[in-house]
C-alpha cells in the first residue's frame, strides 16, 4: 500500500510539472534544469527472517543527480529529482554469546567477524518540495519516491572457517546466509529524506541530505521452500551534492 501511495504522489507531481505552463495562473511557473554529482556514506543492513543479529554495515555512495524544477505553488517549490548512484551496501553480523559478549573462535583465538559487501547501481526518482530561497540563500527540502537497484557484485569478509565456528557459544545459530550468494539481482523500494540547500547565482547549489531507503524486494528467495521468508535491504544515507544550472527561468523576481 505504501508503494502505491508513493507512486501516485510521484505521478501527480510529474503531471503537474508537465502542465505547469498551462497552470501559471495557479502557481508561479518555473522551468529550471540542474545537473551535478554527489557522494556520502551508507549505513545498511538486511532484514532477515529468521532474524540475524547485525550491526550497521558501513559503505560509500557516489553518483549523478538531475533536477527539474517546474513550479512554485504558494511557498512550496516543486521539482522532480533523478539520480544514478554507485552504492556499497550489505550486512555485518553481531556474533555474541547469551551474555552479549563477542564470541571468540577456539581455533584462531580471535573474535568471530562476518561481513557481506554488496555493490548496487541505485536509481531513485523523487518528488521534491522545497521552502526558502531559490537563487541566493538557504532552502529546506523534503523528497520521496521509488528507487530501483541493480546488483553488480559481492564480497565476503570473515576471519574464521565456517566449519570451525564456535557454535556452542553463539546466541544465534542462523548461518545459511553466510554461504548464499545474492539470488535476486533486481531490488526495489521506497526512499525519502530531507535536507538543506545553499544556492549562489554564480556558483551553484550545495545540498546536505539525510535519506532512508526501505527495500520492498528480497535478495534471496522467499517461497515456502526457501530458508528465509524475508531478506530486504534497508539503509540510511548521509550525502553531499553539488548542482550547477543548465537552464534557468527568465524571471528577475525569483530570489
Tell where the protein language model's regions lie, with residue ranges:
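Extracellular/periplasm-exposed beta-strand and loop segments of Gram-negative cell-envelope proteins
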Residues: 45-57, 89-121, 151-187, 218-235
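Residues on the lipid-exposed face of transmembrane beta-strands in outer-membrane beta-barrel proteins
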Residues: 37-41, 62-70, 86, 123-131, ...
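Sec/Tat signal peptide C-region and signal peptidase I cleavage site
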Residues: 20-24
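Transmembrane beta-barrel architecture of outer-membrane proteins
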Residues: 57-63, 79, 118-124, 139-141, ...
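Sec-dependent N-terminal signal peptides
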Residues: 8-18
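Short glycine/proline- and aromatic-enriched beta-strand/turn motifs that initiate or cap beta-hairpins
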Residues: 25-67, 243-245, 255
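Predominantly the C-terminal beta-signal and adjacent terminal strand-loop region
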Residues: 89, 187, 192-255
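Short loop/turn motifs that connect adjacent beta-strands in outer-membrane beta-barrel proteins
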Residues: 25-32, 71-78, 132-139, 200-205, ...
